[in-house]
Amino acid sequence: MTEEGFWKFLEGRGRADMVLYSTETGDPDIDAAGEFIRGHALLPEDYNNLTERELEEMGELLFREKVKQKTKEAVLILLAHQVSDTALTILTKFNMRPDKPLVYFARLALEESLMWNGNP
């Protein structure tokens, strides 16, 4: 999956209903958490019906150097909401060496994935 293909895939699936609000604080960790929360607005209506192949293709984007940070954030959000060993494995692997600007964001995604997958 290409970065452009990912966004077309995402745009074609609609959006899950939600209300979000957060503000910038100046604290990098708190602001990253706010960005993570706002990122949930990207979840498609059928976010829990992604195939293992789709998860793998999206996950590959995390490990490509030239993929934009916003794309990686969207992938992290989608993977975080999957009840899937594949998604959990990808997030665990990415958290071993995340892109520097995504360290906290990636950790939040992994923690959310652990929750969805029944691991405290």
What are the residue ranges of the model-derived segments?
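Positions within the helices of HEAT/ARM-like alpha-solenoid repeats
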Residues: 67-72, 87, 101-102
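Long, acidic/serine-threonine-rich intrinsically disordered regions with weak helical/coil propensity
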Residues: 1-40
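Positively charged, hydrophobic/aromatic-enriched amphipathic segments
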Residues: 9-14, 112-120
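Amphipathic alpha-helical scaffolding segments comprising HEAT/armadillo-like alpha-solenoid repeats
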Residues: 16-20, 51-63, 84-96, 119-120
